[in-house]
Amino acid sequence: MKTSIATVSISGDLREKLAAIAAAGFDGVEIFENDFLAYDGSPAEVGRMVRDHGLEITLFQPFRDFEGMPEQQRSRAFERAERKFDLMQELGTDLMLVCSNVSPLALGGIDRAADDFRELGERAGRRALRVGYEALAWGRHTSDHRDAWEIVRRANHPNIGLILDSFHTLARRMDVETIRAIPGDRIFIVQLADAPLIDMDLLYWSRHFRNMPGEGDLPVVDFMRAVAATGYDGPLSLEIFNDQFRGGSPRSIAVDGHRSLVYLMDQVARAEPDIAIDVPALPERVAVSGIEFVEFAANETEAEELVLLLRAMGFSLIGRHKNKDVVLLRQGAINIVVNTEKEGLAHSSYLVHGASAYAFGLKVDDAAATVARARALGAELFEQRHGPDELAIPAIRGVGGGVIYFIDGKSELAKVWEIEFEPANDAGNDAGLMAIDHLAQSMNYEEMLTWLLFYTSIFKTRKLPMVDVIDPAGVVRSQVVESDDGGLRLTLNGAENRRTLAGHFIAESFGSGVQHLAFSCRDIFQTADRLTELGFNVLEISPNYYADLEARLGLEPEFTHRLRARNILFDRDEGGDYFQLYSQTYGEGFFFEIVERHGYRGYGAANAPFRIAAQKRTLRPKGMPRV
């Protein structure tokens, strides 16, 4: 499988782009003409720089407004093409992209266009060059890959071929199955891009909102299955125009791009096993049966406060690590680890972020296979020295530099608590909490696509539609990633400014990370009463919320009174009811949530503005120093 990406897809100057593309593992690069024109080196120097990075130039692009022009403009178009051929030979590439004409001067007619390409093919052939024709979705006369293919077919020249671009086909909702009839050897290169479904002008949509395959809503897998069925075995190249990417990190965007291609072709190869493209074999996407544990890093004072808070939620301290300053608290199937070590990643994380949930462990069928898939998709492995009676738990780095561990039932990993911890007889008072319902990570909005692709490519999950959560200081974008059975539920919350609750958390903890944990319970009313007995400080909700709730959902006054008396929030969808109870904030915005579900599949987005307003009232006032 030969991977490629257009230089226009990432930020930086040409030198920075090439370094990032090579580091991400791509085989080739499309040179976008503006990137070349802005660089102060000669074509030969650019070609050498590309090859010095271990890359090849898969394509030079774009060449515009060529076919179907009146005679005066037609002659000029061929003169321009010859100049581009000179440039290509100096660069060291043999393929040029010609996009369909958008000029108001362009004349229609498939035969006229085919004649032009036949002559261009003759000129290219004399130089051992090739030309690929692409139908722009907004082309004046050619906006459909079927018409572009017919022009190429009638041109009937070995140096003229077709270029397919997933965006141009899918944005116009064309039938991708028509691609299967095209001979694979007549497709010179395939360009790939995804995009969110937005109803807007095609050109503007394409120029500003494309993203990596798997990050948007277009059926790119179906498109690529049809391409693969033709027998095509050439480069797979990303061409992404995205305002957010233009200001992002070249290296992280390039890594996302390579991950997206590997993930895309893994899906295609599983659906079309006899394709000609040589796709690397990966373990299947990983099914997660639950969150085994969450680990906090803290100093002694903050750890003591956290343990007291957890005890007030009904947790028992059941274990102390044999070799480290680490304790284990449990309630139901919830394991919370509190780490106060003075060395290792936990300590480093504490020094940077303060007290935080820096790691969590997922229950999987095969931890080694999970890491193998993650590594093939560009995830960074995590390892650290372990002592006697300690297991080497497979792990990767995640959001904010945190760690995701993997626990399976087929090895010693299933006995990690018995192997590494001494029992502690510090029983608490059970409050009816059962398991971790979901985990929420706050991050800068610009990071959301990265982590969305990270989770959906490695784990057997799906993404739900993005939701705008209204904070008194702005909007937070919330993206749910979940497995069908609820074994893994994550909410990714993207902050665009520091004044929102999520933005405050990111700013004060110096980076993205886990901002809240939600625990499921058997009976939220009994749990709320038990928490009151244990001295748990519940988040107080405005009484105005309950008056509106009763009217909006037609609740019985008695039921509303029970909710209000315990500061329980309530929501309902077509599946059933949902109850939520929150802790006050801990540290710089971390909090716990307790939920009860009755067929409800959402996350209480309707209640979020009222919860956030209540939480912000409890935060340290602006300008007040930390104690």
Give the ranges of each region predicted by the language model.
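N-terminal pre-domain/capping segments
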Residues: 1-93, 254-285
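Hydrophobic faces of well-ordered beta-strands that scaffold small-molecule active sites
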Residues: 3-7, 29-31, 57-62, 96-98, ...
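Acidic-and-aromatic substrate-binding clefts and catalytic sites of carbohydrate-active enzymes
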Residues: 8-15, 32-43, 65-75, 103-108, ...
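Glyoxalase I/VOC metalloenzyme domain signal
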Residues: 14, 23, 270, 275-319, ...
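A structural motif
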Residues: 26, 88-93, 187, 232-233, ...
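Acidic/histidine-rich catalytic cores of soluble enzymes
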Residues: 28-29, 119-217
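Alpha-helix-loop-beta-strand connector modules within alpha/beta enzyme cores
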Residues: 46-63, 114-127, 152-157, 218-223
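Active-site acidic/histidine proton-transfer and metal-coordination neighborhood
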Residues: 67-162, 171, 252, 256, ...
